[in-house]
Amino acid sequence: MRLVDAHCHLEVKDFADAAPVLERARAAGLIHAIIVGQFHGPGDWGNALELAAAHPEFLSPTLGIHPHEAARATEDDLATLERTCARPEVRAVGEAGLDYYYDHSPREAQARIFRLQCELAVKLGKPLVVHVRDAHEDCDAILGEVGVSKGVIHCFTGHTDAARRYLDRGFYLSLSGVITYKKTEALQDAVRFAPLDRLMVETDSPYLAPVPHRGRKNEPSHVVETARKLAELKGVTLETVTEVTTANAAALFNLNLR
């Protein structure tokens, strides 16, 4: 098995010692993971960069300003983000987007910071990693206005109509452990609708552990359960899901996988 975890947060304090986590990931069949550096204050992106630099054969970083933190981001933060995302080892901009479920930042601030990161991704020619919750129409509108056509909707939990919109823009959909949960029929219908060659699998570690690990801290090794559920929903083998989703991640993030 050669899986890629397309979105994890190994830089957070929940993973004070990443070494055993990475060992378990390799033992489970993972060959790479995308570590998503989030912004909570000055210096936060450094954690993801340092961890990825220590394990370049297994981890690749992306950097962004999460919508929860949009109101806190300063012009200096945005300048730092642009300068750092221009580095070749940074594979994408984000996660960036809109979150109307929690609304931790005013929606106007979320939209402004999201738009700026969309523009940055286009300027740098890098993919955009999108976080969107209860805001699909506004998110799709901004993507269209800026002209972003290369990216991934991380932890996609929308309905078929939302999936169709993003797929029509050329985006990938990344699926988390949520697809293994009960009462997610609408999401599962969207997964059945989406072509396998536009899908990825992720953990969003340490959050959203899939069944049978739900309720515990998530980690990259658990992405196997999400891949297994995806195979069930698509009516294909786990090997097929592994091959295709890994190829998708490699294509979007420009990964040289061995």
Where are these regions (language model features)?
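Mid-domain alpha/beta scaffold segments of enzyme catalytic cores
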Residues: 1-258
